[in-house]
Amino acid sequence: MIEKRNIFLVGPMGAGKSTIGRQLAQQLSMEFFDSDKEIERCTGADISWIFDLEGEQGFRYREEILINQLTEKKGIVLATGGGSIKSKETRNVLSARGVVIYLETSIEKQLIRTQRDKKRPLLQSVGQCPQFFQTLAKERNPLYEEIADIIIPTEDHSFKIVAKKIIHLLEKP
């Protein structure tokens, strides 16, 4: 059986962090948190409203504080926001307090998975622009890789299969 260590999922929007995170938590009998949902719960406001009011910098500050608090818990699965790794402090905290799993996916798959999502603030202004996703990937992928203990492609498999693969990898000594 897997010891109850924290599992932190990082990766771009549309990689499946929330869906896979819920499945992992359920299968491993762990508590699940989604940093975006927790910010909304704590503030009573949705993320796009926070972005409108405080800008990305204000949102990232809130996110950094929340992730620091959540990662102090034991035995959790945490799905982080795609841009959370922009903060050096957040990268350090994630690396130090659990197993970081980078859910990797292609820009094409991101476009498909996010096409109907109206709740992502960064997509509100640019829509489904491949160049936007390419810019984010160029900026963020090296940061995901920097802190990843495990890299899992989510491209060609169902999220259920990806969750099973992660559990299998975590069970290895």
UniProtKB/Swiss-Prot annotation:
Subcellular location(s) per record: Cytoplasm
Keywords: Amino-acid biosynthesis, Aromatic amino acid biosynthesis, ATP-binding, Cytoplasm, Kinase, Magnesium, Metal-binding, Nucleotide-binding, Transferase
Enzyme class name: transferase
GO cellular component: cytosol
Keyword Nucleotide-binding (UniProt): yes
Catalytic activity: shikimate + ATP = 3-phosphoshikimate + ADP + H(+)
GO biological processes: amino acid biosynthetic process; aromatic amino acid family biosynthetic process; chorismate biosynthetic process
Binding site residues for ATP: G14, A15, G16, K17, S18, T19, R120
Cofactor section: Mg(2+)
Record: residues binding Mg(2+): S18
Pathway assigned in UniProt: Metabolic intermediate biosynthesis; chorismate biosynthesis; chorismate from D-erythrose 4-phosphate and phosphoenolpyruvate: step 5/7
Pfam families: SKI
Known EC number: 2.7.1.71
Xref: InterPro entries: P-loop_NTPase, Shikimate/glucono_kinase, Shikimate_kinase/TSH1, Shikimate_kinase_CS
Cofactor binding, per record: Binds 1 Mg(2+) ion per subunit.
GO molecular function: ATP binding; magnesium ion binding; shikimate kinase activity
Residues engaged in binding substrate: D36, R60, G82, R140
Function, as annotated: Catalyzes the specific phosphorylation of the 3-hydroxyl group of shikimic acid using ATP as a cosubstrate.
Subunit structure of this chain's protein: Monomer.
Family statement drawn from the similarity comment of this UniProt entry: Belongs to the shikimate kinase family.
Protein name, per record: Shikimate kinase 1
The organism of origin for this protein: Hamiltonella defensa subsp. Acyrthosiphon pisum (strain 5AT)
Gene: aroK
